[in-house]
């Protein structure tokens, strides 16, 4: 369906848990409180809502967290989503710590693609960012995904004074691997609000100095990679490409096509907005499908025109692990 600004909304980010097995400094550091188990939607509730979202025009679902693979039997949910009429693509965003062992079940369930979050290629920096020693497991998960033939995108958050010296090395993973390495600006949300942002335009200029033949993909090539916010570049002879997601310095709200459902069943039409609808309350109070559909449609219709990351009077205080990063 279309929102009030005539944007076609067809993409749902579905957070299945607020839990994570890493403690990334900008998302979920040590000491945060976890939700009570009953506060999180069951798979049956997620699938009921997914069927209703499909009736509203949602055809793509991305399963996120927290870390989605820490929730038991997530492949079961993927299979249920793939079996939902109207849902054509189901993707996963993961830190890949558990990916190698769970990938066979996910492939059997029909998973269409995977995004892997990795900010460094150095074990000691991985420990600094995540407070955990799981770098080898992430490497194994990434390798397993690449070998499976599943479309893979690698998401990296550039961090001043932390990983900024190895961003070219990360980008160069796209040279010999048919994947997209994407650099996402640090967003002023939750714990990331206090951290400096390396801008997308700044990083793109830096890469252009390193690779003089760096050039944008054609519109057809970009379309084949999806219709998300990333802008892609490549170097002649490379198997993959480099993407830039500049949420702060390259606002892309005019073409936004997605909404988010948190693990608690709160529908957020915009990442940076506190407005939305508590679908869990409706579900558990006995609302019928017509009432739920009306609530979903009203929330999508009311999606804000744009975020206000640059407006310090409108801070987004909720952690990314709760929103669904």
For each feature predicted by the language model, list its residue ranges.
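Radical SAM/AdoMet-radical enzyme domain recognition
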Residues: 40-63, 70-184
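Conserved, mostly hydrophobic/aromatic
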Residues: 16, 20, 24, 63, ...
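Auxiliary Fe-S-binding modules of radical SAM enzymes
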Residues: 1-11, 176, 186-325
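Residues that scaffold the ATP/ADP-binding catalytic core of kinase and kinase-like folds
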Residues: 23, 27, 71, 124, ...
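Short, small-residue-enriched loops and turns at beta-alpha junctions
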Residues: 16, 35, 67-71, 159-162, ...
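A short acidic, helix-capping loop that chelates divalent metal ions and anchors anionic groups
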Residues: 32-36, 122-129, 190-194, 278-279
């Amino acid at each position: 369906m279309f929102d009030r600004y005539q944007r076609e909304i067809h993409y749902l980010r579905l957070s299945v848990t607020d839990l994570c097995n890493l403690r990334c400094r900008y998302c979920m550091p040590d000491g945060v409180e976890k939700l009570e188990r009953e506060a999180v939607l069951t798979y049956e509730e997620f699938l009921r809502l997914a069927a209703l979202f499909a009736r509203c025009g949602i055809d793509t679902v991305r399963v996120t967290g927290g870390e989605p693979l820490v929730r038991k039997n997530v492949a079961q949910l993927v299979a249920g989503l793939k079996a939902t009429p109207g849902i054509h693509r189901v993707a996963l965003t993961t830190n890949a710590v558990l990916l190698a062992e769970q990938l066979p079940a996910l492939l059997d369930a029909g998973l269409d693609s995977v995004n892997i979050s990795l900010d460094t290629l150095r074990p000691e920096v991985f420990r600094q960012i995540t407070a955990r020693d799981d770098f080898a497991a992430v490497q194994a998960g990434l390798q397993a995904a690449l070998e499976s033939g599943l479309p893979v995108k690698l998401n990296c958050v550039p961090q001043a004074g932390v990983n900024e010296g190895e961003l070219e090395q990360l980008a160069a993973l796209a040279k010999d691997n048919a994947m997209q390495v994407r650099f996402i600006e640090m967003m002023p949300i939750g714990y990331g609000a206090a951290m400096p942002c390396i801008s997308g335009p700044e990083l793109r200029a830096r890469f252009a100095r390193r690779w003089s033949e760096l050039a944008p993909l054609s519109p057809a090539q970009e379309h084949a990679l999806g219709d998300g916010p990333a802008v892609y570049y490549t170097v002649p002879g490379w198997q993959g490409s480099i993407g830039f997601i500049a949420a702060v310095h390259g606002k892309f709200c005019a073409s936004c096509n997605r909404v988010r459902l948190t693990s608690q069943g709160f529908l957020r039409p915009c990442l940076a907005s506190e407005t939305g609808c508590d679908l869990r309350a409706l579900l558990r109070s006995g609302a019928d499908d017509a009432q739920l559909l009306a609530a979903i449609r009203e929330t999508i219709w009311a999606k804000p025109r744009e975020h206000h990351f640059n407006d310090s009077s409108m801070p987004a205080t909720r952690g990314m692990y709760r929103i669904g990063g």
